[in-house]
Amino acid sequence: MFSSNTFDINAYLLNLREDTTSIDISRKNLDCLPDLTRFTQLKKLICSHNNISYLPELPVGLLYLDCSHNNIKCITKLNESLEYLNCSFNIELSKMPLLNDKLMLLKCSDNDIGCLPPLKNIEMLCCPRNRLVSLPELPPTLTYLDCTNNGMRDFPCHRFHKGLKTVYCSFNKLTRLPEFNEELEKMICANNQLERLPILNDKLEILECENNKLICLPYFNNSLRWIDCSHNKLEKLPSFNNNLLHITCGHNKLKEIPTLPHLLDFINCESNRIEKLPALNRNLETLICSYNRLTVLPQLNNAVARLDCAHNKLMQLPVLNENMIQLNCTYNKINALPMFNDSLEIIIFSNNPIYTTLYGGNITLHHHRHSYMQNVMDMDEYDEFNTDSITSIRNLSQKVKTLNDFRFLFYSLKYKSCLRNFLWEKIRRPKIEAKYHPDNLHKLLETMSEDDDVSEMWIADN
């Protein structure tokens, strides 16, 4: 029976012409597929998101088949003409049939597959979240590979084939990677057991190798735009190229950061051992440097909008630019705050001397999560903000201005006499002593006689 409560598959198919080239019967609550062989011109069949448990014989000319999100347990044979197959999310599917020579794209993610057949002429292979411990030989036609979340320990080659451009192999047990080919543009190899990386090819643009066992990185090529090497054992980074836009290198053992490239707009170097940061480039928008050993911050450029410098040893902050939106400087030794701009939306500065100065310990913040920033500063994850515990930015700004004005007045008065004494001792006194020194008395007398002559002439004229 091929019907559901709302869809009659037989009636639907009877209304189709036999030369139909495309059929979409997805999400129809079907338990099985009817005979479709009479549609001799059928090229595309979508039967995803049903309850189908097996695939019947299909039209010989079929090129595109999407049977994902079903209950298929076995696929016995593929049409010789099939070019695209998506059989993902059939959680009991444990084996794939032999692939035909024309198949170019295979998606078989989120199944129970333990091994794959020879890949022949595959161009795109997506097989994440299976039980694969290895892959068959990778064909030279392959341009895209996603084998994320398996149990792989190695690749079946020493060097990626020339045409491969994108590789996702995170969440495996890989201890090494093949040499990168010349065309590789994107390598995502996070959450493995890698201790080193191959030399980066010239065209690589994106490298994500976080959560490994890396102790060093290869030199960065000039094309690299994005790197995430966080959660490793790195003690030093190679020099940054001028095209880098995004750097995430937190949770390592870094003591310093190389000179920042001109185009960089994001850097996260939290949870390291850094004592001093380099000068900030003019395009930087987000700086995350929490959980380090910083005692001073570099001057902020006009582009920085998000700054997290929590859990350091800072005693003061640099002047805030007009574009600052979010500031977190909690858990430092800050005893004074700079003036705020009108664009500032969120500031977190608890657990600093200045907080006690402004609020006298009467207003406290709840404990917050110690790590809340990944790719961007996400202040929404803070659960301690409420109307009883946070004063508006405007009121806080007024408090800071009043305090800063008072400090200026206090220190002006306190050091006024010191300044006067300093000027007397260093400038006026030496000049007076030199002028009236006995060695200079004859000069003084000459000056006095000239003064007398001038006085007599003035009296005579008047």
List where the protein language model places each region.
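Conserved hydrophobic beta-strand positions in leucine-rich repeat
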Residues: 21-23, 45-47, 63-67, 83-87, ...
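Leucine-rich repeat
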Residues: 16-20, 38-43, 60-63, 80-83, ...
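Leucine-rich repeat domain C-terminal region
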Residues: 311, 326-335, 341-412
